[in-house]
Amino acid sequence: MTVSNNGMAMPSVPPKIDCSEAIQDSPKFRATVAQHAMYFNRLENRLNEMLRHITAMIDFSKNYTNTFYKLTVSVNQLCDESFSGNPLASTTFQGLSEAYAHTVNLFRTYFDHSNVVTFTKLSNFIKIELTKVAESRAHFENMSQSMDDALVKNASISRQKPADATEGRNALTAVGTCFAHTTLDYVANINIAHAHKDHMILDALWTLVRESSAFFSKGHATFDEWTAADNGAIADTIQTFAAKSKLIERKMQDVHSLVPKEMFQHPSGMPIEPDVMMEGYLYKRSSNAFKTWNRRWFQIKDKQLLYSHRSTDLEPATIMEENLRICLVRPAPSNIDRIGCFELVTPTRIHLLQADSESLCQDWMRALQRTILALHEGDSVDVASTSPRNKTTSMSSGVTLTSANAISPLSNAMDVTKGRSVSDPASTYTSANTSSISTAAGFSSSTTAFEQVRRVPGNEVCADCGSPAPKWVSINLGVVLCIECSGAHRSLGVQTSKVRSLCMDSIDNELRDVLLALGNRQVNEIFLAHLPPADSIVPPQINEKSARPAREAWIKAKYVERRFAVAEDTRARSSATNRQEHLKHKTSIGGNSSSNGVNRSSSYADVQDAESGGLLDADPWSADLSVPVPTASKRLSACGSDTNLDAIGSSSIDTKTVEWDSVKEACECGDLLALMTAYAQGFDLNALHNGTTALHIATRNGQTAAVEFLLLNGAKINMLDEKLNTPLHLAAKEGHTLPVCQLLKRGADSNLANVDSKTPLDIAMECTHADIVTLFRVTIMRNDFNADFNNPMDETVEAVISDIARRAATEKEQKKTESLKSTSDI
């Protein structure tokens, strides 16, 4: 065995083939033939690499020296990999390699010498010798298959058919004879190739050295001098490396002094990573029924608590708690009969951890408490740096977070250190901000997302007033806002603008893709496409010093009335049309009030308007997502519901001005700018066209960002197409795991059946999409245990769903990277 430059073990020259083994077609013969095939493939690859280098020497004369160096490296690799079994050839190759390397140093002015002879000889060896071996191998494999077929046919002939037996025996004899000759031809070509290999390749390489030496008489003299002086220089180098190796050996003898005198009593040194506050092994009690203790590697990194398995695979760390700001640390209760235990308490669960000693337990508790303190001190700085008019910070759920409430978890943690314990985590946070509970966001990941979103063109200032360094975002509009404008957006209601904090709220991958695809500059180009001259804008544009009423008036005109998204004459015509349609619609509703209430023939139904209940603002994986809906409301018209009447009353834009074809194409390719343009011009995202909706198309094509955009902007999650398929049906059919996760975590009904009486679970099982089937089953399992507030099943289900979603996102990213790489290669 030899070792190549990349550290991989390479097989040496295969053993010679015994002809008797070849006639018998024994397993040993097959194995030896396979080794020779691999050997010649490797040899051909290396020779082709050398030919490419020689061609480069011819074509790029100015880079001759560098290309010659690459050829030298290739010769070294060829010697190590293919000629280690032949000492004479190996020695000769080493001498040639040294000559090539010396040529690089001496002939800096050497341009475009004739390398045709060398190239021709090596090419002839590949085209003649190696091609014969390849053709013989192909004939051998074909005859081997024919031989196997003849043997099977002969073995299956009945004794009762002597004629067939004779015919089969004759055929077997003929095929066997032909196979034997083909095998021997193959062996002969292999042996001939090995015989010609040494002298042909050596002769080709020596030709280049000989011609170079003849062309440069001075170089020939230099070669003689170099040969005489070479041994001493190499010996000195070896002695230098030997001295360095002995020094390293002596240093390695002192490594045992690093072992501490008291193991498992104190943290083992400072963390290597600068952003890691503390790290080490802890035991974590699982939440399953067995309550097993598992040893995991924990880190307090980027103000998050992470843990990972001890394995040879470098897997990404799992985030135990993304937002330590809403957590507290306390010693374990007295009923835990294990030393060094402590608890990390969140509003919804309790993590029980164990250190290797009581001193390490105290170190971990202090480190976590310092992290929580740093988080709250950071919040205090943010609140102090805001405008004096905004003494309280309004969170995503609409609850006002005062500075006292922000410190309440920390105060509880401080009480624990003084000996006062908290028995119920839920009661501990009764007075805390409820939005912090639903915002279990990763501080590190939010910071990363914050930086990514801020790098989008236009996001360095507020989208509405131009204030610098905005820290809030309207997730459905895709614009970044200052804190004053975010308050005005929040007053519009979540049906118009859903405001989140870039620093404190969770931004998952799909939402991040939406924000990165839009941005202030492009969204303003859409909503301000028909902005009149500055002196005739009503209401006037705002700036960072504008008062709250002016902000509200401008933002309402921009996003609710969409006054500047379409031309003024178009808005005037569409306003009259909409008033007529509104009156007709009210008349039709009044006339049909005595009937069943909804005309099924107009369009297909939305089964459950989950978004109207505020599910988009709740914890996506909370256990209480299911909203009971009366039977009579399960067939609401997609285009004739009360929500559409409100939209007609509030917007004076004709939805017919937006072409369905452009929306369909945008959903198929994930063009969020086109979708935002259609939405700004009044397109009804729940409208049914040709028996389908925009959400159905985006889901069917696996466009997760488009699905996220549509759901954020009011697309009904359980909408039915002409075959009574919900988007969940289509995602399960196409095997799109991420859209299934998106729909399930927003409360999509997985029990609805289409015209074929099949639920999404039935379709996923038919199409054998294992991950999607698992998602449906664990969701059903979670719903079965929904009555228990802190049952261990919730954590297990969340872990399974998160793992599947993470794996699907990773696979999607890998496929995208491979596609881009293949495109660039083409």
From Swiss-Prot:
ANK repeat feature ranges: 690-719, 723-752, 756-789
Explain the consequences of disrupting this gene.
Answer: Causes a delay in cell death during embryogenesis characterized by a decrease in the number of cell corpses at the comma and 1,5 fold stage and an increase in the number of cell corpses between the 2-fold and the 3-fold stages.
Query: How does the entry describe the domains?
Result: The PH domain binds phosphatidylinositol phosphate (PIP), phosphatidylinositol 4,5-bisphosphate (PIP2) and phosphatidylinositol 3,4,5-trisphosphate (PIP3), and to a lesser extent phosphatidic acid and cardiolipin.
Q: Which GO terms describe its biological process?
A: apoptotic process; endocytosis; negative regulation of 1-phosphatidyl-1D-myo-inositol 4,5-bisphosphate biosynthetic process; positive regulation of endosome to plasma membrane protein transport; protein transport
Residue stretches of biased makeup (Low complexity): 588-603
Encoding gene per record: cnt-1
What is the recorded phenotype of mutating residue 284 to A? Loss of phosphoinositide binding. Causes a delay in apoptosis during embryonic development
- Give the protein's recorded name: Arf-GAP with ANK repeat and PH domain-containing protein cnt-1
Is Signal tagged as a keyword? no
The opening ranks of the lineage are: Eukaryota, Metazoa, Ecdysozoa, Nematoda, Chromadorea
Tell me the domain of life.
Answer: Eukaryota
> What is its subcellular localisation?
Cytoplasm; Recycling endosome membrane; Basolateral cell membrane; Apical cell membrane
Q: Which organism is it from?
A: Caenorhabditis elegans
| Predominant subcellular localization, coarse grouping | cytoplasm
